[in-house]
Swiss-Prot record:
This is Uncharacterized protein YhaP. Its main location: membrane. Keywords: Cell membrane, Membrane, Transmembrane, Transmembrane helix. One of its GO terms (cellular component) is plasma membrane. GO terms for molecular function: ABC-type transporter activity. The chain crosses the membrane at residues 16-36, 186-206, 235-255, 283-303, 318-338, 340-360, 369-389. The keyword Transmembrane helix applies. To M.jannaschii MJ1024. InterPro entries: ABC-2_transporter_component, ABC2_TM.
Length: 419
């Protein structure tokens, strides 16, 4: 058992100190910091001249005051600096061409009273400015039309206000709208964490085994400790590497959100990922299914890596495993909108999909305990089977050198393990 801990510690330390780990962690942390501080970064580069200067040519000589009022309601961030111009259309157009102005809006009204507008700029690639002006002019049209008909603005506002429709689950024990809102953030997080963890760390395990095999170190290791101990020492070692990396990334993100609570980006992200009111049961299930997903695919990756003779062949060999993960993730993404769909229920009992899809159902629905227990049991049984078969393939596979298909290599590994 002492050798097990020595190998686990060796694997963990080697991976933690590796340049690839340090670089990937730093890059990911920087990306998280950029996302959580996006507003501050944008304002830093834009400065005080960030507002777009827009001139309005009001050919009606009466609509600009109403338009200006509606624009203030639409442009809540104050990104546009809009002013009425008394100059002619040609003169203002010249200013736009000279880049004294970013754009111009011409407001017209025909004989029938229909209000229209034309927006001019050097380029029309900035859809946000156009949409803001269009929305303000549309509201101007509504305000002017209703005023001429003698309808008050308050009446119009009440007519256009969206109808509030509450949701109430009638099934006993079903999750309420509030409970779903609280758990959806955790479900999203766990689906992505499981997906990326399996993709990254399972590939790392396969690469680790293939690397040691190519250096002939494996032959010495196999003779010094049981293959199943060796395999799980690597799985746990790299698993701890993953937990360390996730802890650093999540810690950096949480700290950044706390320091930028007033920013709109931080508040929206923090609101979506609000886990304070999530039930303890859901959190426990999240941990269980994360561990199951990791060990399931890590065990599979370990013995796939052991039958590879060249490091260059690792990605090709683990491609079927990667496709399984991608398929499970895509099904889970669809299931977020329809967690009670029949095929979601069926696929949640397929062990390679269970960690993601069963957790989705546990988080979004109030399923019977026996369904979650069966899913966990099937996955555990699959892990045990993969571990037993994998240990034999691992033992024989590390002694295989030469080019052959994965299927032939597995058969040869099982045959060597018996001898």
């Amino acid at each position: 058992m002492n050798k097990f801990w020595i190998m686990l510690s060796h694997t963990y330390k080697n991976k933690i100190m590796a340049k690839s780990f340090i670089i990937s962690t730093v890059i990911t942390v920087l990306l998280v910091l950029v996302v959580t501080n996006l507003e501050s970064i944008i304002s830093l580069f834009q400065g005080d001249d960030a507002k777009e200067k827009i001139a309005v040519v009001d050919e009606t000589n009466e609509l600009y005051p109403v338009f200006s009022k509606q624009l203030k309601a639409v442009d809540t961030d104050g990104d546009l600096d809009v002013k009425l111009s008394k100059q002619s259309e040609d003169e203002v157009t010249k200013q736009v061409k000279d880049e004294s102005l970013d754009g111009m809006l011409i407001i017209k009204r025909d004989e029938k009273g229909t209000i229209s507008g034309t927006y001019k700029a050097l380029t029309i690639s900035d859809e946000s400015t156009y949409q803001t002006l269009q929305q303000a002019l549309t509201q101007t049209k509504t305000a002017v039309g209703t005023a001429e008909l003698g309808v008050s603005q308050e009446t119009i506002s009440s007519l256009y206000a969206p109808v509030t429709v509450g949701q109430k689950a009638l099934k006993e024990g079903a999750k309420s709208e509030e409970e779903l809102g609280q758990t959806v953030g955790l479900v999203y997080i766990m689906l992505f964490v499981i997906y990326f963890s399996v993709i990254m760390y399972a590939s790392m395990i396969a690469m680790e085994v293939a690397t040691e095999k190519s250096s002939r170190v494996m032959e010495i290791l196999i003779s010094s400790m049981p293959p199943i101990q060796q395999m799980f020492a690597k799985l746990l070692g790299i698993g701890l590497v993953g937990i360390t990396q996730l802890a650093i990334i999540i810690g950096a993100g949480s700290l950044s959100l706390k320091l930028n609570q007033k920013s709109e980006t931080a508040s929206s992200v923090g609101g979506f990922l609000n886990l304070t009111d999530v039930s303890a049961t859901t959190v426990i299930y999240a941990v269980i299914f994360f561990l199951l997903g990791y060990f399931l695919y890590a065990t599979l990756a370990a013995f796939l890596g052991s039958v590879v003779s060249r490091i260059e062949d690792v990605q090709q060999t683990i491609t079927p495993m990667t496709l399984l993960v991608v398929a499970g993730f895509m099904i889970a993404m669809f299931g977020l909108n329809a967690p009670d769909a029949g095929f979601i229920t069926v696929t949640s009992f397929i062990p390679f999909f269970t960690p993601m899809i069963m957790f989705l159902r546990v988080g979004m629905l109030d399923i019977p305990f026996w369904q979650a227990a069966v899913g966990i049991g099937i996955t555990l049984l699959t892990i045990v089977i993969l571990a037993v078969i994998g240990a034999r393939i691992y033992k024989g596979g590390v002694l295989i050198y030469g080019n052959s298909s994965a299927f032939k290599a597995i058969k040869q590994a099982l045959r060597l393990a018996k001898n």
